[in-house]
Amino acid sequence: MTKQIKKQPLLSGLLILFLAAMIFANIGGNMYQSFMPLYIKDLGASIRQIGLFFTLAQIVPLFLQILGGWISDSLGRLRAIAIGSVFGVIGFIPMVIADRWEWLLVAVAIGSIARALVGPSFDAFIAEHSSEENRGKVFGISQAIFMIVSVVGPPLGGWMAGSYGFRLMLLVAGIFYFIAMVMRLGMAREAAKGGASAPQKLSIDSLKINLRTMFGMIASGGLVTWILLTDGLRDVSFQFSENLLPVYMQEIGGLSLQQIGWVTSVFGICMMLTTIPGGWLSDKVGERVGIAIGMIFMSCALLLFINIPRDIPWLYFIGWGLAGVGIGLLTPAYQSLISKAVPAHMRGTAFGLFSTSLGVISLPSPWLGAQLWDRVNPQFPFMLTAIVLLLSVIPIWIKFKLPATDRKENAPSKESAVVTTV
């Protein structure tokens, strides 16, 4: 039996099809995400209003992420993703026809339903289709394939926005997402026909049980507590500056829309090249090593960004490359660590709860970042983020250790190690 398990491919046919649908959906998403602050600015928003927009845009997801994870745990990953994809397509409509930046909040609210259902399901689905000893590696390979979207999406979006305007670019992005929706609906239908997953009844009692268990783990002061605290600190610092970076590159760096697309693509290439080594590193020496090194790389990238002279724009490529390496190293490690730290039947709820908790903590951060841009200087929000990332390495190195007992409790049985459909 052991030999048969070892012969199982790291990526099953279903997982490859799952990733293909994700690629189509997120090529559409990456075509506009890097340019969303600039689109808001194009519709008449000031720097402070851009910060306010991204603060308000976080409110709806706060109420949906936990519900999305719970629905994923109850109905199954593929069903939850299919339902979310329908809302994702609908969300593109107000985005394309908006004539004021305030209308984009409607698009973001509808899109939040899609992200709430798809986001927790993505990591949980991959975790369920991998054995524990190879989980970091599978997350790394999946992320490497998935990062095609960051290589293709931003340059395509930048070229279309610069040449034909934001609306046509968003329309094409919506077509990519529509193709993904059709694929996902087909996968969910086939899973239902084959009886691959038995959906549970959605009930308030089951939600209460899941939340009670998760809050107990958070309050215990163990690994889950420290993951939440350090990731919350990281998210707060990122929200200070993340949504202002495209504006910074355009106004301070002097980059065009096409150039912003290309430097963002370098981020995707470097992340794609490092996620597999990051997953391997996670499996071999532990998750905290990749997470700590990734934080250092991202901090260095931000410090480089704020010191780039306007007449040397090619340094932005190096900065985005460093950021891509950092994210590539820490992402599979984080995903692997969370999936091992919580019970298998609650992974969707766990990923949703983490997203919600982080959103609550970082809710005012985009608005505060915009205030710091205006009241101090444009570089200050990025410098603050870089300092926080460096300081977070200390608790990560000390506390991000999975106890041996947890590894045994979460280890899959020989039967569950064989790839199955959801």
Regions found by a protein language model. Name each.
Residues M1-S12, E190-W226, K414-V422:
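Juxtamembrane intracellular "pre-TM" segments in multi-pass secondary transporters
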Residues F35-R48, N243-Q258:
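Short amphipathic helix-loop junctions that connect adjacent transmembrane helices
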Residues Q58-I66, S150-V151, G268-I276, S362-L363:
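Residue-level signature of mid-helix packing/kink "hotspots" within the transmembrane helices
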Residues L64-G76, A161, T275-G286, W373:
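Helix-to-loop junctions at the C-terminal end of transmembrane segments
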Residues S74-S85, K284-M295:
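Cytoplasmic membrane-interface "Motif A"-like loop-to-helix N-cap segments
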Residues V86-D99, F297-R310:
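C-terminal ends and interior cores of transmembrane alpha-helices
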Residues V108-F146:
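Cytoplasmic helix-loop-helix junction between adjacent transmembrane helices
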Residues I175-A196, S392-F400:
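C-terminal membrane-cytosol helix-exit motif in multi-pass small-molecule transporters
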